[in-house]
């Protein structure tokens, strides 16, 4: 067994940035990643099934996705679900790429608002690291945003903001509210060996072009060529420590289920704000009975998830193809990102504008029910490409009751306790969500929306705060450089170390902190104590919970084709229902005319094998019933099946113009029309 200079657990954003810095310094690096590589051709991309797959095996929720590499997350005691991705690239594979830095005051919440704590570092100390990771990820945007100190200038020009972005920008110029062309980790032109964005609108299910800055593309391929050893299918069970209390490596299980051990002088955790506390708590020893690095009792506590609200505005007269813009953000607003006591709550939210999605989302908007029968075609045509969507990212404060613990009833497929999330939105958060929803409605009405609708977000992937940094070991888990107070050669570089959440998407800050921590370790490596690898390893603590009920995630592969059980009677019944739900119009065919009860429902079920049993059961228990005679659940299942199959029809796609291939690359706005129109003048003049 070879001892690595550094062992990194997790191959997402923070692990990649840290690995690059260690490799640049000539250190030997081993990375253990429990997922696998995903080839770009496996992503849904421009396939008509993309929206369906995003709700199934390409969901950002591990509990829905259920891949063999995933670990389940118990969120039954949480107001929000938790999103992640297990594989090379981590969450960057499925994130939308909106790339914002935290604001200077986000690091000084105690000083500014008298709540939570200040960070043990400032924006100024992080700025050079922000700049460096912007270059690594290929960030596009427009410099000069007055909400930031000078120097926050992206290395590539901004992506187009489109007709919808321009409408809302004009409204904010008239209202006197801040707006700015969005900053995204998405390339507008060929660079860094990557192709430019082609505006597929499917960033959230993997970028087929490599334009989005996911670390499987931006970092890991190059790092492997340079000698970094990246082991996939490696599920880490425990961080090992020696008798002196120093980290000496990790125990892990390979693809076959065999136990392995990797020794290292330094261990770096890059497992996200749920995975890292889970691993620390599972690594309890007799010397660390409450979990590794947990003498403060803070491991897993103060979880922050960025509760999100959404507001849709429906407009008239825009092009149906407008929904296909990149999914990062078109524009963003920080008008209300700071605190104002007159609002009745502390802290604020950042707004990010995008389109409201494709035909399936249009069909079921605004309430998850949609419109059916003769009204269906007008309903979809009035929304597809004609809706703008404000995502309101609210800052939640760190609260001890919001936490991650080890489940006593749920394990992953190797028997390791799952993470159990306890999270409740506070009164402050609820007031913030309601207030920002009203302001976002005002914004879209000012932009000319003929209808505005509030949307609930049930989950988020911004996982922060569960191993917070600080200078006092009694009140923090790691020091300002990410080194654990209790285990000085154990370093945490993911969102766990956040002291407060800010309201910016956290990936930029996570990456900058990871680079800062890795750079500090490289510069001071001689001062880092090392374990005596010839000595004995501390045994696990016997009180580490072992769940009584083992639950294994479903295994999903892109090639899996379910066995269908639709009889001819089932298909006849579905055909009758289909033409009631989506009849013909002067411009659109009926569902039955394009093959919904035949080959299209087969394509639908191939994309969503998890829905086969429910559809078969519903068809058989409603046989002979008209739609109006069915219960709500039956109507829901059948509407989804009919619409899901209908919008897979190439003829329907052609008539609605929601899939016009081939797509040309975007043309970056080197001198955008909104500059010529003066839409930024009031922002810059304030």
Regions inferred by a protein language model and the residue ranges of each:
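Surface-exposed patches in mature extracellular/periplasmic domains of secreted proteins
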Residues: 140-148, 182-184, 451-454, 585-593, ...
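Mature-region segments of soluble proteins
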Residues: 553-560, 573-576, 588-591, 595-606, ...
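N-terminal leader/targeting peptides and immediately adjacent processing regions
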Residues: 543-586
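A glycine-rich dinucleotide-binding beta-alpha-beta segment and adjacent secondary-structure elements
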Residues: 181-203, 210, 237-241, 385-396, ...
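Glycine-rich loop(s) and the adjacent beta-strand/alpha-helix scaffold that form part
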Residues: 21-24, 28, 35-47, 209, ...
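Conserved redox-cofactor binding core of oxidoreductases
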Residues: 55, 59, 70-77, 98, ...
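Mid-to-C-terminal "cap/lid" subdomains and adjacent gly/pro-rich loops that border
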Residues: 36, 68-69, 266, 270-386, ...
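N-terminal glycine-rich phosphate/pyrophosphate-binding loop and immediately adjacent elements
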Residues: 1-111, 115, 120-131, 234, ...
